[in-house]
Design a protein with these regions (language model features):
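Intrinsically disordered, low-complexity regions of eukaryotic proteins
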Residues: 4-5, 14
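Intrinsically disordered, low-complexity segments enriched in serine/threonine/proline/glycine
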Residues: 6-9, 21
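Exposed, low-complexity/repetitive linear segments and helix-based recognition motifs
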Residues: 9-11, 32
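General helical secondary-structure elements
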Residues: 11-12, 123
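Acidic, proline/serine/threonine- and glycine-rich low-complexity intrinsically disordered segments
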Residues: 14-23, 28
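N-terminal ligand-binding/catalytic initiation module
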Residues: 30-180
């Protein structure tokens, strides 16, 4: 964290506190010169080994039937009941406290313009891996296929409970101000 400049923003969606983290340094620089890559090299990078840049791994051992039973059914019943009694316990028993949603509708992609939600996916995946690499925060990209600010806000409100943070990215003005 000390090598990057981060800005924290707090949101209160129906008494649910969420935070958003934005990093300011996102380019590869050498002595103030940005490195350039060919389109072919960039496409090969994004398609090498597995497509995309994100994968999900278990933080617990999954080597026995017992591990699987604890991770899913019937083992999840105990934390489910605890979270039901006290929703704040979700931070203790789930990834919520270290999980950020990186959200876009693709209406203002990195100087490329309005190319749509699915076209923004490589950028959102890229931001998610920056969170992991530089802050050890797990992040997942969510592309919302809508240009309606109210619909976007409602979508975010509905799934915000799953995340400790929300990062809004590449949403065109003036909608970005309405949504934030």
């Amino acid at each position: 964290w000390k090598d990057r400049n981060f800005i924290f923003k707090k949101y209160d969606y129906e008494k649910r506190s969420c935070f958003s983290i934005f990093s300011r340094c996102c380019c590869t620089c050498k002595k103030n010169k940005i490195e350039h890559y060919s389109d072919k090299e960039a496409l090969e990078f994004h398609n090498s080994n597995k497509s995309g840049k994100i994968e999900i791994n278990s933080s617990k051992p999954m080597t026995s039937k017992r591990d699987l039973a604890l991770a899913y059914s019937p083992g999840v019943a105990a934390p489910v009941k605890e979270i039901f009694k006290n929703p704040e316990r979700a931070y203790d028993y789930t990834t919520k406290g270290n999980l950020v949603a990186v959200i876009s509708n693709g209406s203002a992609i990195l100087g490329l313009g309005n190319l749509g939600a699915i076209a923004s996916k490589p950028v959102m995946e890229g931001k998610a891996v920056l969170f992991k690499r530089f802050a050890d925060i797990d992040a997942i990209d969510l592309e919302i296929d809508s240009k309606d600010p109210e619909e976007i806000v409602n979508s975010i409100k509905n799934f915000a409970v799953s995340f400790g943070g929300i990062n809004l990215e590449d949403i065109a003005a003036p909608d970005c101000f309405i949504i934030e």
